Amino acid sequence: MPRVKAAQAGRPGPAKRRLAEQFAAGEVLTDMSRKEWKLGLPIGQGGFGCIYLADTNSSKPVGSDAPCVVKVEPSDNGPLFTELKFYQRAAKPEQIQKWIRTHKLKYLGVPKYWGSGLHDKNGKSYRFMIMDRFGSDLQKIYEANAKRFSRKTVLQLSLRILDILEYIHEHEYVHGDIKASNLLLSHKNPDQVYLVDYGLAYRYCPDGVHKEYKEDPKRCHDGTLEFTSIDAHKGVAPSRRGDLEILGYCMIQWLSGCLPWEDNLKDPNYVRDSKIRYRDNVAALMEKCFPEKNKPGEIAKYMESVKLLEYTEKPLYQNLRDILLQGLKAIGSKDDGKLDFSAVENGSVKTRPASKKRKKEAEESAVCAVEDMECSDTQVQEAAQTRSVESQGAIHGSMSQPAAGCSSSDSSRRQQHLGLEQDMLRLDRRGSRTRKKAQK
């Protein structure tokens, strides 16, 4: 799903950027730490960059089982530079491993940064970055499954995405564009999912000081229109609550097959107003997307919790995970770390032989589509504009009034969160009664 930008509504487009020259297999690049990397075959090309298979330099050619990829673009282009800053600050292997260890995770779906540098070829300078290699993206799998994921799979995916968001948020960044095409399966383990494309990752809290809430008409509707946050619709810089709101829309689409505003994506104001209306009436959103009786109560509780967040408030990530875990219990399941991409009907798995084939294809896929890992020229210019905006004074947001700093909100808001926890317990009890009836 392509981004829908305000540039399409009359703003001038960015200046054209140079295309990357294609390198031959076997070319050796030397990163800033003097480590050498050998290129394999190209596996993707976008508007101005290329992606190649890569491995540490040796006398052997880089094979199809290469563990890494290298992203290359002309050094005077912007996207890779922006993405590189995120990886250097937040995605070094030792940082990720420390987080996994201290938070007792099996893995963390943030690609690891292995190195970067500049490379001269034919009198031209190129910037490159080495990162992990991945398999298929979730958008392809979603479409192959008639645009449905099972309820268990949606909840499993979302738990892992919450792990990712907590990590990048704690490292002062927000993603701003969570969607299926930016979620890639591990090349070797189809039960692991990774969030990619940090070309527009926004440093919302540099040096511990949160950006202030400020609406900028020039920035309205930034992002992928059907998923972007209400803040983004109003031209406000990305924040933690925006990432969580976007994840909520993804969950609803993955489970129901659509979002209520998808019928008129040509009108950004219609999309914005629809989201505001449904944010204020989550029950109506659930009724619209899930007209059947078996509604996913955990998603409603998640959306209710997220809408209480202030612009600068630190989310209670474990509370959100607990909501989704209660949803798994309600359907008689648990967080087993398995992603089942079988065909589904009405949120339930419908087994068919082809599902094993698709899972194998997802596991063996060597395609890292450059469109899923790089941003467009328009995104680059607009990201630069966002970073240049000076935040002056707080403005009340429709989601709630911003608070100062990067801390959590006051005790009254905590009481609202406690109320949600009580709702979660009621949801769990209803799930238990449902299972007992089924056993009888």
Curated annotation (Swiss-Prot):
Entries under InterPro entries matching the protein: CK1_Ser-Thr_kinase (IPR050235), Kinase-like_dom_sf (IPR011009), Prot_kinase_dom (IPR000719), Protein_kinase_ATP_BS (IPR017441), Ser/Thr_kinase_AS (IPR008271)
Record bears the keyword Cell cycle: yes
Question: What modifications follow translation?
Answer: Autophosphorylated at various serine and threonine residues. Autophosphorylation does not impair its ability to phosphorylate p53/TP53. Phosphorylation by PLK3 leads to induction of Golgi fragmentation during mitosis.
Where does the entry say this protein is expressed, by tissue? Highly expressed in testis. Expressed in liver, kidney and muscle. Weakly expressed in thymus, bone marrow and spleen.
For the Protein kinase domain, which residue ranges apply?
37-317
Q: What is its EC number?
A: 2.7.11.1
Which positions does the record annotate as the modified residue Phosphoserine? S342, S376
Phosphothreonine PTM sites in chain numbering? T378
GO cellular component, as recorded:
Cajal body; chromatin; cytosol; Golgi stack; nucleolus; nucleus
Q: What is the effect of changing G135R?
A: Results in defective assembly of Cajal bodies
Q: Which parts of the sequence are annotated with region: Disordered?
A: 379-440
Q: Can you cite a GO biological process for this protein?
A: DNA damage response
Residues that bind ATP:
I43, G44, Q45, G46, G47, F48, G49, C50, I51, K71
Residue positions of the active site: D177
Highest rank taxon of the organism: Eukaryota
Q: Where is the composition biased (Polar residues)?
A: 379-391, 398-410
Provide the function of this protein: Serine/threonine kinase involved in the regulation of key cellular processes including the cell cycle, nuclear condensation, transcription regulation, and DNA damage response. Controls chromatin organization and remodeling by mediating phosphorylation of histone H3 on 'Thr-4' and histone H2AX (H2aXT4ph). It also phosphorylates KAT5 in response to DNA damage, promoting KAT5 association with chromatin and histone acetyltransferase activity. Is involved in the regulation of cell cycle progression of neural progenitors, and is required for proper cortical neuronal migration.
UniProt protein name: Serine/threonine-protein kinase VRK1
Species annotation: Mus musculus
* Upper lineage: Eukaryota, Metazoa, Chordata, Craniata, Vertebrata
